[in-house]
Amino acid sequence: NAAHQFHRREKNDDRYILAGYPWFKCRARDTFISLPGLTLSIEENDYFELVMKTAMRGYYEFMEGKPLTAHITEIEQPDVPLWAVWALQQYAKETSKEECHKKYGQFIKDVIRFIQDNKHPNLELKENGLLYTNGRDKAVTWMNSTANGRPVVPRTGYIVEFNALWYNALCFCASLAGAVGDEADQQKLLAQAEITKKSFVDTFLNEYGYLYDYVDGNMMDWSVRPNMIFPVAFDYSPLSQDQKKKVLDICTRELLTPKGLRSLSPKSGGYNPIYVGPQTQRDYAYHQGTAWPWLCGFYMEASLKLYKRTRLSFVERQMVGFEDEMSY
């Protein structure tokens, strides 16, 4: 199976996911985003659990300020714990909430508490229920290209997918608590989620019906980027159905290609869709217009969630575009 080329086993029996060939290592964010697709989707739940066991050990070491024994890079990035909870949410859907709670409930609780207690060095939970991150001088999101030591896309402050992930994590954690009869914990999490939901809409939704990419004080980034697809695709979203449809429509019109979603709309300033030339030139194009295939999974999920079977043939046609790449 093509997925197996990314599975890595070390001598001590630790299991990892390689971020890519030829030079990418095992990176925390990439691990949690890709793990469900590289394991659960091909019915390899056991390998999911083995990778998660290694990754959990690494994240506990990070939370406790201990030296890392797990060979996972970028574990300090602020969205890593949020993607970890998302990955476990996919495991719960594949198995059951009860099974997920039994194996990973304590880890999920510890991660949520770690964030709520503001113990992460670059993830601050504000009174409005949103997460704030400093990304001015160092790239902190998946759009992490740098040039001359500075992020090409300096996303900072309230970052749209971080807060969509946070709302989703709170609601998922509440649903796990409900599945095992912990009503007190469930209600506490839902109350927190409600605060986050209102602030998310007030902060990110703009007058044109799409979402700001990030907001930092009076600075609102109007760039049309694919990060707004995440709150449409997640199981728990702070957006209403009508709001989701408007966001999806803009993603379809301005970002969708046969091979993925553009990292920036052609109508936005700085659009650069051609990834060629010397390293610096490529760094400036990396997240400024080039299309990314992995985002299509979330786009397709958003389409099916909103339009059900009426979008099935459309999604199938989108997937056909990847066949040549997969059989190259």
Which positions does each model-derived feature cover?
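Acidic, mature catalytic/reactive cores of soluble proteins
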Residues: 1-328
